[in-house]
Amino acid sequence: MAEANTMRRTATGKVISNKGDKTITVLVERRVQHPIYGKIIKRSTKLMAHDEENQCREGDLVTIEECRPLSKRKAWMLVNVVEQSKA
């Protein structure tokens, strides 16, 4: 079966944990408007992502891309490190 070229979702967020082997936890924040009051509020999601070379550290700003499920909670993979953390 031929593989289809589909657009995969991407997200940019901050690495909050790299304790797992080849796994990072990325906090992705987004701003949404409250449906009734109209105020802009922050919403966040923690995503598990695959880091094949263990190159990320806590505090890094990274771009991740959706992929096939790699484990129960991990269905994203690291694309690149946008900004290294200072520490």
From Swiss-Prot:
Name one process (GO BP) from the record: translation
Keyword tRNA processing annotated: no
One Pfam family from the record: Ribosomal_S17
* Key words, A-Z: Ribonucleoprotein, Ribosomal protein, RNA-binding, rRNA-binding
GO cellular component entries: cytosolic small ribosomal subunit
Q: Gene3D superfamilies, from UniProt? A: Nucleic acid-binding proteins (2.40.50.140)
For this protein, the record's InterPro entries field holds:
NA-bd_OB-fold (IPR012340), Ribosomal_uS17 (IPR000266), Ribosomal_uS17_bact/chlr (IPR019984), Ribosomal_uS17_CS (IPR019979)
- Which ranges does the record mark as transmembrane? none
Q: Does the keyword Membrane apply?
A: no
Q: From the UniProt record, which GO molecular function terms apply? A: rRNA binding; structural constituent of ribosome
The source's domain of life comes to: Bacteria
Q: How does it assemble?
A: Part of the 30S ribosomal subunit.
Report the family membership: Belongs to the universal ribosomal protein uS17 family.
The record's section on PANTHER family has: 40S RIBOSOMAL PROTEIN S11 FAMILY MEMBER, SMALL RIBOSOMAL SUBUNIT PROTEIN US17M
- Describe the task this protein carries out: One of the primary rRNA binding proteins, it binds specifically to the 5'-end of 16S ribosomal RNA.
Protein's UniProt name: Small ribosomal subunit protein uS17
